[in-house]
Each structure stands twice: as C-alpha cells, then as structure tokens.
Regions:
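Short helix-capping/hinge motifs at transmembrane helix termini and TM-loop junctions
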Residues: 60-68, 129-133, 158-164, 176, ...
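Glycine-rich helix-loop "coupling/hinge" segments at transmembrane-helix boundaries
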Residues: 159-161, 173, 188-189, 230, ...
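Transmembrane alpha-helix boundary and packing residues in multipass membrane permease domains
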Residues: 53, 126, 156-160, 169, ...
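Alpha-helical transmembrane segments
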Residues: 56, 178, 182, 231, ...
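Gly/Trp-centered helix-boundary motif
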Residues: 1-122, 126, 133-134, 148, ...
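Short alpha-helical transmembrane interface motifs in multi-pass membrane proteins
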Residues: 15-16, 105-109, 124, 136-140, ...
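Amphipathic cytosolic juxtamembrane alpha-helices at the membrane-cytosol interface
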Residues: 93-108, 112, 132-140, 190, ...
Length: 305
C-alpha cells in the first residue's frame, strides 16, 4: 500500500478557513418571491397595465369631468373626436367616461366577490380539515351537492328572485364560487394539521378557531394569493356575461358587460361603441391572467432552490 506523503497536506488556520466560506444572505419567503416576480418581465408588464387600468378607472372620469348620464340627442353616435375621445353612444353620452366607470364597476364587483369567496372558502375548508371525521364528511358532501348544481342556473334563480343590483349580483357570484377554494384549503390543511407547531398550540390549550386562523391559514397564504389572482378574472368574465345578456346590473347602473351589449346592437354602423369596451375588457382579463401565472411561478415552493 502506497504511503501518503506529508507534502500532500496543508495546514490551514481558522482565518483562512473562514475566508473561503461562501455566505449566502438569508432571504425570507416573500423577498425571494418578490425577487422572482421582478425577474419576470411579462408578469411585471401585466402588473403595470393592471395598475394603469385601475388608476384610469378611478381618476379618468374625475379628470375628464364629462356628464355620462344626461341624454343629449344632438350629440348621439358621434365618432371619436376632441370632445368625445371614445365617441358618444346612442344617447349622446361620453363613451370614454362610461367605459372607465364600467371598468371600475366590473373590477370592484369582482374583487369584493372574490374576497368573500376566499374568506368563506378558507374558513369552511379549514374547519372541515381540522375537525376531520364525520364533520369533514358532512361538510364535503355539502360542497359536492353545491357543485352538482349548475352555477349559471343558481345565479339566474337568485337574480330573478332578488332582482338586479350590486349586492344581488355579488351574492349570485359568490353562492357557489367558494367551493373550489374550500377544497384547496382543506387539502393543504390536511397536510399541516399534524405539524409540531399545531400540536404545541393544542397542548397550550388554544381553541380550534384560533389554531385555524392563527397557525394553519397563515401557512397557506401563498395558495390564497394565487386563488385570488386566478378567481378575479373569472368573476369579471362571469359578471360581464350576465350583464351582456341583460341579467346583471339594472339601468341606470352599468358595467363593461352592459356597454358591450349596447355596442353590439350598434356594431354595424358605429363599431367604435363596441371596440373600446372590448379592448379594455380584454386588457383587464389578459393582464390578470398573465400576472397570476407570474405569481404562481414566484410563489410555488417547488421552484425554490
């Protein structure tokens, strides 16, 4: 057996050893997710477009200061010009102002309905997963029954019974949409239920509601954010479809779907009345979907090093 020579070894002191250690800064989950998101130019562009649309929907009608409700027959169906930037509709109202107000209404309804969906779904799924047993079985069977009912039929039934309005429309949009979130949260909490910090909280006498809201749900915040980002565009499309069919908001209230319905009737002679609401709606849906995909890539733990 060959003898190992001492010349092959080198005595290294502690100072030199420390100098060769590569120290990686400690980055939190959210900082790492934000770093990943910033490196995605497509998602950041979508975020910029979303912020611009929201700012326009809030401030454009104020800065424009045009009457969007009074009927002026002398100025009806005017093409885009210096006075009416998007033209005027069949009643002489400023289409630019109406488009951005309609966008504000559609986005606000979608955001509120989505938040209600997520809150109800998180609590429902969290309680079902934490309690387990017969409670979980009963609660999940209720979810399956609701999913078996066509959501469009249930939505139309609510709108027919309660009438058309902001609150009625939000209730109709929320009545079954929360079930998907409940299933997702239930599956995640089933994995977290046996964690050490949950067992420690139980040993300290924490109530089930406190454990769910303070320990379990905060550890699913990434999934909740993704659920919000993916649900908002779906709700906007659903609300727009209902309003387009005349089943959404009642006159004089309007949204992008109402403007699309009115523009479709005048499309043959005044195509701009359909064009501008369509462009704004497509930008909103596309931006939300692209930004949601970027968020998913940034928050997915499987992509983390």
């Amino acid at each position: 057996m060959e003898k190992i020579k001492d010349s092959r070894f080198e005595l290294v002191d502690q100072a030199k050893l420390n100098s060769e250690v590569v120290v990686r800064p400690n980055i939190s989950y959210w900082k790492d997710a934000w770093r990943r998101l910033r490196k995605n130019p497509v998602a950041m562009t979508a975020l910029f477009v979303l912020v611009a649309i929201i700012l326009m929907s809030v401030f454009a009608p104020i800065l424009r200061n045009m009457d969007y409700e009074t009927v002026v027959t002398a100025k009806k169906n005017l093409p885009p010009n210096s006075e009416f930037w998007f033209g005027s509709d069949g009643m002489g109202r400023d289409l630019f102002t109406r488009v951005w107000i309609g966008a504000r209404v559609s986005i606000s309804i979608a955001i509120v309905a989505t938040l209600i969906d997520v809150v109800v779904g998180c609590l429902y799924g969290g309680i079902a997963a934490y309690c387990g047993g017969i409670v979980d079985e009963i609660m999940m069977r209720i979810v399956e029954v609701l999913n078996s009912i066509p959501s469009l039929i249930l939505t139309l039934l609510i709108l027919v019974v309660l009438g058309n309005g902001y609150y009625q429309l939000m209730l109709a949009l929320c009545i079954t949409a929360w079930t998907g979130c409940a299933r997702m949260i239930r599956g995640q909490i089933l994995q977290l239920r046996e964690s050490e910090y949950v067992l420690a909280a139980e040993a300290l006498g924490a109530s089930p509601i406190r454990i769910i809201t303070k320990h379990l749900l905060p550890n699913t915040i990434g999934l909740i954010i993704l659920e919000v980002a993916s649900t908002i565009p779906s709700v906007i499309v659903y609300e727009t479809t209902l309003s387009f069919l005349g089943l959404g908001l009642s006159i004089p209230a309007f949204s992008l779907g109402s403007l699309l319905s009115a523009g479709q009737q005048a499309m043959a002679f005044y195509p701009y009345q359909l064009l501008f609401p369509t462009i704004v709606l497509c930008l909103i849906i596309l931006s939300f979907n692209i930004f949601g995909d970027g968020l998913r890539d940034a928050l997915d733990p499987k992509l983390r090093q």
